[in-house]
């Protein structure tokens, strides 16, 4: 179910789906999974996804995205109570027809879009405001949750966050990792959570991999955390064992 082979200029790429658990800081319970693509070439060499997406043709990127979304829908059909975060590639952002096709897949699989969170990146700030606002509004109209990743890597505006009304803000790994050794990082993180991110928005800290950093996040019992300290991404088989289905 979770392996796809793509032909690109007579060369083969194998793509598999993995699932990164997102934990509640209080209780350390899993409340969401993030689906990830893992790409290998014909020599079984692993290729970094972000670098691969920079050089792959749009058709190939869409094929990988389609495969991941299909995997998410199949998973949600098998297990009630799970929600999954799905990262939309930058190359497909603002493509209304593609967004409509994702919504159609939910209908074909009888899966509620409300169980899927579409994650967009910081490149959103480089897109004309009218286009990005219309795209995100349409995604919300379809019922999808919305998430912004890598937050905190540039000057942020509370007003823009309120305008786009993200359900979840993911604080960048580069900001979170090492806060115990960097008072400046820690101060920035506190400012973003306490003053910039709108109240009621879910906050997830990426890259929590040190106990010293985790201890400083303990004041925020409501936030979510990701990182190898808790779990590496899971294969579909490992996820089935963990969730018992």
Report each predicted region and the residues it spans.
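Bacterial c-di-GMP phosphodiesterase EAL domain
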Residues: 1-110
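EAL-family c-di-GMP phosphodiesterase catalytic domain
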Residues: 1-29, 37-44, 119-126, 144-145, ...
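The cytosolic transmitter module of two-component sensor histidine kinases
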Residues: 61, 65, 98, 131-132, ...
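Aromatic/hydrophobic pocket-lining residues that form π-stacking "cages" and hydrophobic walls in ligand
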Residues: 72, 102, 135, 192-194
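Alpha-helical scaffold elements within enzyme catalytic domains, especially in hydrolases
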Residues: 74, 108, 137-138, 195, ...
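Extended hydrophobic secondary-structure segments that form protein cores and membrane-embedded regions
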Residues: 85-87, 117-120
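Distinct, well-ordered alpha-helical segments
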Residues: 94-107, 127-135, 155-168
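Short helix-capping segments at alpha-helix termini
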Residues: 108-113, 142
């Amino acid at each position: 179910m979770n392996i796809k082979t793509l032909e690109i200029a007579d060369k083969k790429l194998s793509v598999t789906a993995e699932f990164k658990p997102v934990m509640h800081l209080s209780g350390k319970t899993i409340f969401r999974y993030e689906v990830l693509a893992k790409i290998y070439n014909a020599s079984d060499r692993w290729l970094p996804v972000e670098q691969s997406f920079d050089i792959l043709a749009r058709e190939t990127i869409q094929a990988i995205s389609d495969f991941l979304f299909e995997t998410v829908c199949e998973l949600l059909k098998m297990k009630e109570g799970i929600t999954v975060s799905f990262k939309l590639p930058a190359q497909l952002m603002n493509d209304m027809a593609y967004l409509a096709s994702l919504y159609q897949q939910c209908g074909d699989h009888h899966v509620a879009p409300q169980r899927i969170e579409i994650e967009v990146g910081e490149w959103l700030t480089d897109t004309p405001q009218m286009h990005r606002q219309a795209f995100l509004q349409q995604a919300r109209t379809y019922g999808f949750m919305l998430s912004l990743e890598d937050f905190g890597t540039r000057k942020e505006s509370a007003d823009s966050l309120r305008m786009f009304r993200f359900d979840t803000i993911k604080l960048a790994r580069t900001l979170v990792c090492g806060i115990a050794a960097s008072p400046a990082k820690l101060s920035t993180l506190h400012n973003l959570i306490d003053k910039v991110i709108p109240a009621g928005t879910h906050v997830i800290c990426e890259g929590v991999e040190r106990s010293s950093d985790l201890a400083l996040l303990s004041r925020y019992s409501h936030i979510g955390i990701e990182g190898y300290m808790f779990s590496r991404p899971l294969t579909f088989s490992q996820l089935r064992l963990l969730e018992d289905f």
